[in-house]
Amino acid sequence: MRGGPVNSHDVTDEQWEGLAQVVPLRGRDAWPSAVGHRSIPEAQTEARRRFVVLRVNIFADARDVAETLMRGIPVLLDLTSAETEVAKRVLDFSTGVVFGLASGMHRVDRNVFLLTPPGTEVQGLMEGVGVPGI
């Protein structure tokens, strides 16, 4: 389906609108560049404005969380359908990944967390719910 979600876990900007907004901390020209360094073309930058929703039910799914975040893609981690012990293990694992990557973790709702790669700012979360970083 062209223009729609890539898979059942991808979310479009329209679906995300009104919940929170993920934006880069600085513009692409804000940092000094090394000699010969090329900036990302604007079209590719816009394509990176997506995030992935991962509904984790078993601990083995935690690897998807880490791999997605390591690729620089924000993850909306939904643990609402996981058993309590599995949810605790996945959250503990995800917290370690976030810490290791110097990323951010924001609580969106009970058992729902937004994991953001380094250099990402989250706007629009309810005050007192989001905790920038770990």
Swiss-Prot record:
* A cellular-component GO term for this protein: cytoplasm
Q: Mind telling me which Pfam families this protein's record contains?
A: SepF
Per the record, the major location class is cytoplasm
In Gene Ontology terms, what is a biological process of this protein? Answer: FtsZ-dependent cytokinesis
Keyword RNA-binding attributed: no
Q: Where in the cell is it found?
A: Cytoplasm
Keywords annotated in UniProt: Cell cycle, Cell division, Cytoplasm, Septation
* Domain of life where this protein originates: Bacteria
Gene3D superfamilies linked: SepF-like protein (3.30.110.150)
Q: Does the keyword section mention Cell cycle?
A: yes
- So what does this one do? Cell division protein that is part of the divisome complex and is recruited early to the Z-ring. Probably stimulates Z-ring formation, perhaps through the cross-linking of FtsZ protofilaments. Its function overlaps with FtsA.
Q: How does it assemble?
A: Homodimer. Interacts with FtsZ.
Family assignment from sequence similarity: Belongs to the SepF family.
Identify this protein by name: Cell division protein SepF 1
The organism named in the record is: Streptomyces avermitilis (strain ATCC 31267 / DSM 46492 / JCM 5070 / NBRC 14893 / NCIMB 12804 / NRRL 8165 / MA-4680)
Gene that codes for this?
A: sepF1
